[in-house]
């Protein structure tokens, strides 16, 4: 039995609020159960030096957690003077996943800067960030079209992206782990896919106990089922 009472193949309740903030070109509050992440996509003129004069755009992502998004307060990373390795790893993952969905040759020399800020954490913050950010990017691209920054016929979005966590909890494969499950899981895996059914990234780690190829296949099957439901529900 899962602590939440959910079936092993059951997602948490999903909720998306578009235009959650008024300044960003795209903004989405995404909620997976008690995990809540604010995802914004800002369009900035210009590109990094390595992209200058290429005619192409760029997309980058940042990730952070509010001090009391967790059970006990943590200091802001800005106050500590550096980002943790975990934060750097997560924002690289978010950036990679999102760049796989956007044709950067079609947005001109503009940069889409994605910010994912965890308001409340209850497991799956990185996968929620990827999913919410993909929606925010779609809204930002619509803004660019409506404001003459892109031709109405231009479609930089090659696909949408969604992600979900799976794992082995109490010796059983489960979908969409919350904090209680994630902190006690024998295996934790994150899967990122696009709306065309393609795989973008799989991260899987055994926590003190290995997992079999059969268990991997079951977890992957759960992830594919969950991501399909996410696309049908909120995209």
Swiss-Prot record:
<dbReference type="Pfam" id="PF01138">
    <property type="entry name" value="RNase_PH"/>
</dbReference>
<dbReference type="GO" id="GO:0009022">
    <property type="term" value="F:tRNA nucleotidyltransferase activity"/>
</dbReference>
<comment type="subunit">
    <text>Homohexameric ring arranged as a trimer of dimers.</text>
</comment>
<keyword id="KW-0819">tRNA processing</keyword>
<keyword id="KW-0694">RNA-binding</keyword>
<dbReference type="GO" id="GO:0000175">
    <property type="term" value="F:3'-5'-RNA exonuclease activity"/>
</dbReference>
<dbReference type="GO" id="GO:0000049">
    <property type="term" value="F:tRNA binding"/>
</dbReference>
<comment type="similarity">
    <text>Belongs to the RNase PH family.</text>
</comment>
<dbReference type="InterPro" id="IPR018336">
    <property type="entry name" value="RNase_PH_CS"/>
</dbReference>
<dbReference type="InterPro" id="IPR027408">
    <property type="entry name" value="PNPase/RNase_PH_dom_sf"/>
</dbReference>
<dbReference type="GO" id="GO:0008033">
    <property type="term" value="P:tRNA processing"/>
</dbReference>
<keyword id="KW-0808">Transferase</keyword>
<dbReference type="InterPro" id="IPR001247">
    <property type="entry name" value="ExoRNase_PH_dom1"/>
</dbReference>
<protein>
    <recommendedName>
        <fullName>Ribonuclease PH</fullName>
        <ecNumber>2.7.7.56</ecNumber>
    </recommendedName>
</protein>
<dbReference type="GO" id="GO:0016075">
    <property type="term" value="P:rRNA catabolic process"/>
</dbReference>
<dbReference type="InterPro" id="IPR002381">
    <property type="entry name" value="RNase_PH_bac-type"/>
</dbReference>
<keyword id="KW-0698">rRNA processing</keyword>
<feature type="binding site">
    <location>
        <begin position="124"/>
        <end position="126"/>
    </location>
    <ligand>
        <name>phosphate</name>
    </ligand>
</feature>
<dbReference type="InterPro" id="IPR050080">
    <property type="entry name" value="RNase_PH"/>
</dbReference>
<keyword id="KW-0820">tRNA-binding</keyword>
<feature type="binding site">
    <location>
        <position position="86"/>
    </location>
    <ligand>
        <name>phosphate</name>
    </ligand>
</feature>
<dbReference type="InterPro" id="IPR020568">
    <property type="entry name" value="Ribosomal_Su5_D2-typ_SF"/>
</dbReference>
<dbReference type="InterPro" id="IPR015847">
    <property type="entry name" value="ExoRNase_PH_dom2"/>
</dbReference>
<dbReference type="GO" id="GO:0006364">
    <property type="term" value="P:rRNA processing"/>
</dbReference>
<dbReference type="InterPro" id="IPR036345">
    <property type="entry name" value="ExoRNase_PH_dom2_sf"/>
</dbReference>
<dbReference type="Pfam" id="PF03725">
    <property type="entry name" value="RNase_PH_C"/>
</dbReference>
<keyword id="KW-0548">Nucleotidyltransferase</keyword>
<comment type="function">
    <text>Phosphorolytic 3'-5' exoribonuclease that plays an important role in tRNA 3'-end maturation. Removes nucleotide residues following the 3'-CCA terminus of tRNAs; can also add nucleotides to the ends of RNA molecules by using nucleoside diphosphates as substrates, but this may not be physiologically important. Probably plays a role in initiation of 16S rRNA degradation (leading to ribosome degradation) during starvation.</text>
</comment>
